[in-house]
Swiss-Prot record:
Family matches, as CDD domains: uS7_Bacteria (cd14869)
Entry keyword annotation includes RNA-binding: yes
PANTHER family: RIBOSOMAL PROTEIN S7
Gene Ontology CC annotations of this record: small ribosomal subunit
Stated role: One of the primary rRNA binding proteins, it binds directly to 16S rRNA where it nucleates assembly of the head domain of the 30S subunit. Is located at the subunit interface close to the decoding center, probably blocks exit of the E-site tRNA.
Subunit structure: Part of the 30S ribosomal subunit. Contacts proteins S9 and S11.
GO biological process, one term: translation
Family: Belongs to the universal ribosomal protein uS7 family.
Taxonomic source organism: Rhodococcus opacus (strain B4)
Any one GO molecular-function label of the UniProt entry: rRNA binding
Domain of life: Bacteria
Name of protein: Small ribosomal subunit protein uS7
Swiss-Prot/TrEMBL keywords: Ribonucleoprotein, Ribosomal protein, RNA-binding, rRNA-binding, tRNA-binding
Amino acid sequence: MPRKGPAPKRPLINDPVYGSPLVTQLVNKILLDGKKSTAERIVYEALEVAREKTGTDPVVTLKRALDNVKPALEVRSRRVGGATYQVPVEVRPGRSTTLALRWLVTFSRQRREKTMVERLANELLDASNGLGAAVKRREDTHKMAEANKAFAHYRW
């Protein structure tokens, strides 16, 4: 195991179009096979579709969607004796943002619309309105944590 401690976080460069590190993170989550320009095109077009449908700044829509998807609690496996318990723990802010973006992208890819632009735009709009599969994942995560609250004293 490394002895130097955790690797330092690398600074996120602000997105050139919207000037937001969240958009940069979203582009990096969409990225497949190193095709960054394709990922950027998908994200920018999806944000434009969101702007047309809502009439508001797409970064505000993205932030609202993330706030509705970010989990506050999650469960972690902890082995005590011969049993494995699902122990509820609070989610660190950076991890909650990362999870929210990951869920948005994952559930966008599973949607039925024709293009990825439409899928991402509609998942963002659904999430900003408190609907959609990503918001359901957050609810399920919170339910799991609530159901296993009895094991909270095993926290580390």
